[in-house]
């Protein structure tokens, strides 16, 4: 056998016996360095071209002083070097700012990070979106590992570590994903503080073949690639705060680090670490492909809507010109810019826009001819006037739902509607867009179906191929404009003023007219994945914050060609409604002074209660109406109703728009609520099957209490034929009792204290968990739902195994489409409670009947088609149930549970899913014990002996009772999240609460699939009040891994836990035990990730061990064969050598003989 044949055999054995990456090994040499960072290196507001001396807002952040740091801070960042000597730094694009270098890899690649820490404290590097083992996680927390497995958790000053990450198929982009997915990496010793200090950078993982062979590799599928971090960078959390005070404040001793204005001055509203347009120019060519990789990081205020002026984007196949971004949210957007010019990118959340979160991008023609717009449609003319009016937020004078007067003393509404010498009441001067017949502006255009619009301007409608001509007449006392979303326009028709090098009259002064021309070319219209019509908005942008709070906003509808009838209405839709959810802040209105003067207010009383006065002027409105004063929205049972929902405002404007009584379809997914943020828009379709009078409200509890409610009425109309009756199957019965218990949010503090390596008093959790100094600690009396075996309510269902993780939640109620769910409810608590479910068809109209203490009630929930998964959903959808006597106080008292509805044939007789191996339901909620029914009892039981010493309005006391919990547990005290390697897991992710309940939930070490018509890869779930998501995972990585909310305050407050993946060996030994005990094999059916790709073939999970065993056996055989062949070759080689030696000896002998002769 030749040596080449032996080499071939050894290579074949290697390829069979090992499962290495078949891609590239990409080495990155990163150093952690301290730097001085200037947030505004140009020294001015570039957006307005004003100096800091002329810009009071910019100077409040950027000018240093006696007790102000200014715009320059010491930071710590990642830098890239050419090799392990760390002497030659690799330059990066200037627009990356203080972000670390871009890391790139394809499916099958290995990334080796050679990290060296040149800074003064320990740091790490932790990635999202890639595969790693325990020695390369880069995250410090108690996980049971030790020794070399902990070396990655904290790299000390002067130390180094090599991190090994890979991109297997289970972490790579799916078929439906874009070619490259957006991820990040960051330090994770104390992640919130490390990131605030500057240690964060971008990472992309791409489909195979996307990157070229250059060094560094470049993408072959796009022409330009940009990475933008939108974040309110809180320098108060930086490890260098003391250094920055000492260096940049002229009188460091005068600084009070707890002073509110000082802290505000250190919160930099930045894009890549630049504010007020100081981001170096982002340049690109028109008609070229651009990939925008957008991500966020930060705290509860980090609700960002990135608005790209002048162009449109595609995100997951949907048309938009905005991207909503939250902490640890990653967005990949695609653009082909058409309009050349200098354009604005800004976060249009009002407070962020004012504070400088803006930048420019420049589109050059690059010698390309301008594209010819395919405009074959109509020219649609609109004549719109800005008109000043007196607006009444409560014109009917009472709550439209309860009938109570809005001015009744002590009621909720009287805060906003009681007029006095220190309150304006419910009527304000505002300005509104109004439609007219023609350019003479003499005759108003009235349409009966638009009476519900309220403060909104008229609906502007257009189809793909149309041109929109808007003649705007400003009859108001301030300069105003019209700025649209969702259409194309030249610079002369933009409506926003900024330093773009042009001088067009974009804004109409008082009693001036301006004409705007907007177009809808095919590339701006709805995509194939979009509904027939997309909801957009137009608004005045002379001063976007003050203009919109003054009232200037209206809806815009862009439809596919042929979607509108001759009357301009959408075909195939019986009714359409446009609803704006926003907190109108009258303190920010142009007419604030006029309103105070008209109210004849007492300036002395105002000065005594500034905060209360300003709060009374924040009107939580739907189309400018509070407390169900919006004219009733009437529809018929069986109608196809289009709800066009719009958001506007500031970071508090996080609205979960809930439709009681019926469900919605959003992009083919079944929902009971739609999420809105400032400058985001939703098109939702409803086909109501439940007659009655129902509420529309914001799910955020404080917004609902403040009046963000309306009423819609579903009637059985004679003109509509009844749809075929739903056939319901046999009932599933649940026996549930409300009982009062002592609940401990954190019974074991060892994990928390080990993680932060500190004493109880110095821990982040001290304020929540200590019962000293007038605080209550971690124990509270609560009411919970618990399941029993039958109607005697004597034997509780045990909470072990699959139910252990539920914690404070009630039982997981399951059903299929066509089921009747019967809930027998006994109230063993001391006050009335009920059970109300989202998504289902309840037998009673309105809110369910309450059970008095000791009473037993039976609730019946029917599960029609519209309660189950939509065409774009997973096999099951998640809902929630809770007590609804007082929905807010009941839920905070503990009465909440999960509900799952599946397609037919998914559930086994025992209730489990046949397409999943594990199911977990997790509620991420800040339990506000200040709003619990049991607060007084808890103070008496767990508070100080002298309860009079407790100040219920004290800020520390209020904060201490807000428990940032996962299923009611803090700091990894939740148990039962255990899966086995290779198992398929469904995670039902739930959120309720207030506008601060923004939760971005990150799974370490694992990725999951999110279904939205297609499968998309992610490792973070975005949750908001009233949202319920389902994500699916195949557990692949054995270990104890962290799961946590990525919002800064929530991390420190304990919203984190551990989920454990056990290895194959443990899995199959457990499966054998279960098989012997139950005599039943677990059914493993194929779902998206249920196959593992080995040797180029898709292998079902259940066959992985068999194939692995076979491969090992083959490897052993091949190894023996190779050794035998090697022995043969070695023997043959030795024999040949011996023969050569014999010949040599014989030859030498013959030579000697010849010499002798």
From Swiss-Prot:
Q: Which residues bind Cu(2+) 1?
A: 126, 1002
Q: Which residues carry this modification: Phosphoserine?
A: 1144, 1149, 1154
Binding residues for Cu(2+) 6: 999, 1045, 1050, 1055
Q: Does the keyword Transcription apply?
A: no
Binding residues for Na(+) 3: 768, 777
What's in the keyword line of the UniProt record? Calcium, Cell membrane, Disulfide bond, Glycoprotein, Ion transport, Iron, Iron transport, Membrane, Metal-binding, Oxidoreductase, Phosphoprotein, Repeat, Signal, Sodium, Transmembrane, Transmembrane helix, Transport
Give binding positions for Cu(2+) 4.
Answer: 304, 347, 352
Q: What is its EC number?
A: 1.16.3.1
| Residues annotated to bind Cu(2+) 2 | 128, 186, 1046
Q: Which family does the record claim for this protein?
A: Belongs to the multicopper oxidase family.
The subunit structure is: Part of a complex composed of SLC40A1/ferroportin, TF/transferrin and HEPH/hephaestin that transfers iron from cells to transferrin.
Under what name is this protein listed?
Answer: Hephaestin
């Amino acid at each position: 056998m030749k040596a080449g044949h032996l080499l071939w055999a050894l290579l074949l054995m290697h390829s069979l016996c090992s499962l290495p990456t078949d891609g590239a090994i990409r080495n990155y040499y990163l150093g952690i360095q301290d730097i001085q960072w200037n947030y505004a290196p140009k020294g001015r507001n570039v957006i307005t071209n004003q100096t800091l001396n002329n810009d009071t807002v910019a100077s409040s952040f950027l000018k240093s002083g006696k007790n102000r740091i200014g715009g320059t801070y010491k930071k710590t960042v990642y830098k890239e070097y050419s090799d392990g000597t760390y002497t030659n730094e690799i330059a990066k694009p200037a627009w990356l700012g203080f972000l670390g270098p871009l890391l790139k890899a394809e499916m099958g690649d290995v990334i080796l990070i050679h990290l060296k820490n040149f800074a003064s404290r320990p740091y790490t590097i932790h990635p999202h979106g890639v595969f790693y083992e325990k020695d390369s996680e880069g995250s410090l927390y108690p996980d049971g590992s030790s020794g070399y497995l902990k070396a990655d958790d904290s790299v000390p000053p002067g130390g180094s570590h090599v991190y090994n990450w890979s991109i297997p198929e289970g972490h790579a982009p799916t078929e439906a994903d874009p070619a490259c997915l957006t991820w990040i990496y960051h330090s994770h010793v104390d992640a919130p503080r490390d990131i605030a200090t500057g240690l964060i950078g971008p990472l992309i993982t791409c489909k195979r073949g996307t990157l070229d062979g250059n060094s560094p590799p470049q993408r072959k599928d796009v022409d330009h690639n940009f990475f933008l971090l939108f974040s309110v960078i809180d320098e108060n959390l930086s490890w260098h705060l003391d250094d920055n005070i000492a260096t940049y404040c002229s009188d460091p001793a005068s600084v009070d680090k707890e002073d509110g204005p000082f802290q505000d001055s250190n919160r930099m509203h930045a894009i890549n670490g630049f504010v007020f347009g100081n981001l170096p120019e982002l340049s690109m060519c028109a008609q070229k492909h651009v990939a925008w990789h957008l991500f966020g990081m930060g705290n509860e205020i980090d609700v960002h809507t990135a608005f790209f002026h002048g162009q449109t984007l595609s995100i997951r196949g949907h048309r938009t010109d905005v991207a909503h971004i939250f902490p640890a949210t990653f967005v990949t957007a695609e653009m082909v810019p058409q309009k050349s010019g200098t354009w604005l990118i800004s976060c249009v959340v009002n407070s962020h826009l004012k504070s400088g979160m803006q930048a420019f991008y420049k589109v050059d023609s690059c010698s390309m001819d301008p594209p010819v717009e395919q405009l074959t449609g109509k020219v649609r003319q609109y004549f719109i006037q800005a008109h000043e009016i007196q607006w009444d937020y409560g014109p009917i004078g009472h709550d439209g739902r309860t009938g109570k007067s809005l001015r009744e003393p002590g009621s909720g509404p009287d805060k906003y509607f009681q007029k006095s010498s220190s309150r304006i009441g419910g009527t304000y001067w505002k300005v509104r867009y109004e439609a007219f017949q023609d350019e003479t502006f003499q005759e108003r255009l009235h349409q009966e179906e638009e009476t519900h619009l309220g403060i909104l301007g008229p609906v502007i409608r257009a189809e793909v191929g149309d041109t929109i001509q808007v003649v705007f007449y400003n009859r108001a006392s301030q300069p105003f404009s019209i700025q649209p979303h969702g259409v194309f326009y030249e610079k002369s028709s933009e409506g926003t003023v900024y330093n773009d090098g042009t001088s067009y009259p974009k804004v109409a002064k008082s009693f001036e007219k301006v004409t705007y021309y907007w177009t809808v070319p095919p590339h701006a219209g709805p995509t194939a994945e979009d509904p027939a019509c997309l909801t957009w908005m137009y608004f005045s942008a002379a001063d976007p914050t003050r203009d919109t709070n003054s009232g200037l906003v209206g809806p815009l509808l862009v439809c596919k060609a042929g979607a509108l009838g001759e009357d301009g209405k959408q075909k195939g839709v019986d009714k359409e409604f446009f609803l704006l959810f926003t907190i109108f802040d009258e303190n920010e209105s142009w007419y604030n002074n006029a309103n105070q003067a008209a109210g004849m207010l007492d300036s002395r009383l105002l000065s005594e209660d500034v905060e209360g006065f300003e709060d009374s002027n924040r009107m939580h409105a739907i189309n400018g109406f509070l407390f169900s004063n919006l004219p009733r929205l009437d529809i018929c049972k069986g109608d196809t109703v289009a709800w066009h929902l719009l958001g506007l405002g500031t970071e508090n404007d996080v609205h979960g728009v809930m439709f009681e009584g019926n469900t919605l379809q959003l992009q083919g997914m079944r929902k009971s609520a739609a999420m809105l943020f400032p400058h985001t828009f939703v098109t939702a379709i409803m086909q109501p099957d439940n007659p009655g009078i129902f509420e529309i409200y914001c799910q955020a509890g404080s917004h609902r209490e403040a009046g963000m409610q309306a009423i819609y009425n579903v009637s059985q109309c004679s003109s509509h034929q009844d749809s075929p009756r739903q056939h319901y199957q046999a009932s599933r019965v649940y026996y549930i009792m409300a009982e009062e218990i002592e609940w401990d949010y954190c019974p074991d503090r060892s994990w928390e204290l080990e993680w932060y390596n500190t004493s109880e008093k110095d821990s982040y959790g001290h304020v929540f968990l200590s019962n000293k100094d007038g605080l209550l600690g971690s124990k509270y009396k609560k009411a919970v739902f618990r399941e029993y075996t039958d109607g005697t309510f004597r034997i509780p269902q045990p909470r072990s195994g699959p139910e252990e993780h539920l914690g404070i939640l009630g039982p997981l109620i399951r059903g299929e489409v066509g089921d009747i769910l019967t809930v027998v409810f006994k109230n063993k608590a001391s006050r009335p409670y009920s059970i109300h479910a989202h998504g289902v068809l309840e037998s009673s109209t309105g809110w369910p009947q309450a059970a008095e203490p000791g009473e037993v009630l039976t609730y019946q929930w029917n599960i029609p088609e519209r309660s189950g998964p939509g065409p774009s959903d997973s096999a099951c959808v998640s809902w929630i149930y809770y007590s609804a006597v007082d929905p807010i106080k009941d839920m905070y008292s503990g009465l909440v549970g999960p509900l799952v509805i599946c397609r037919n044939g998914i559930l086994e007789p025992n209730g489990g899913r046949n397409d999943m191996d594990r199911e977990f339901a997790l509620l991420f909620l800040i339990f506000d014990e200040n709003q619990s029914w049991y607060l007084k009892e808890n103070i008496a039981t767990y508070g100080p002996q002298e309860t009079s010493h407790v100040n219920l309005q004290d800020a520390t006391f209020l904060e201490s009772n807000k428990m940032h919990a996962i299923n009611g547990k803090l700091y990894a005290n939740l148990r039962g999240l255990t899966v086995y390697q290779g198992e398929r897991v469904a995670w039902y992710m739930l959120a309720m609460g207030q506008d601060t309940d923004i939760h971005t939930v990150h799974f370490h070490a694992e990725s999951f699939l999110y279904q939205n018509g297609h499968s998309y890869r992610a490792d973070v779930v975005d949750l908001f009040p009233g949202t319920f998501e389902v994500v699916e995972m195949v557990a692949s990585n054995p270990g104890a891994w962290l799961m946590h909310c990525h919002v800064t305050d929530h991390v420190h407050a304990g919203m984190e836990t551990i989920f454990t993946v056990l290895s194959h060996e443990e899995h199959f030994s457990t499966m054998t035990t279960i098989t012997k005990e139950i005599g039943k094999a677990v059914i493993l059916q194929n779902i998206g990730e249920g196959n593992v790709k080995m040797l180029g073939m898709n292998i079902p999970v259940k066959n992985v061990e068999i194939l692995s065993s076979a491969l090992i056996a083959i490897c052993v055989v091949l190894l023996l064969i190779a050794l035998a062949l090697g022995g043969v070759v070695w023997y043959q080689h030795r024999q040949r050598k011996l023969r050569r030696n014999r010949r040599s000896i014989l030859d030498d002998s013959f030579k000697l003989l010849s010499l002798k002769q």
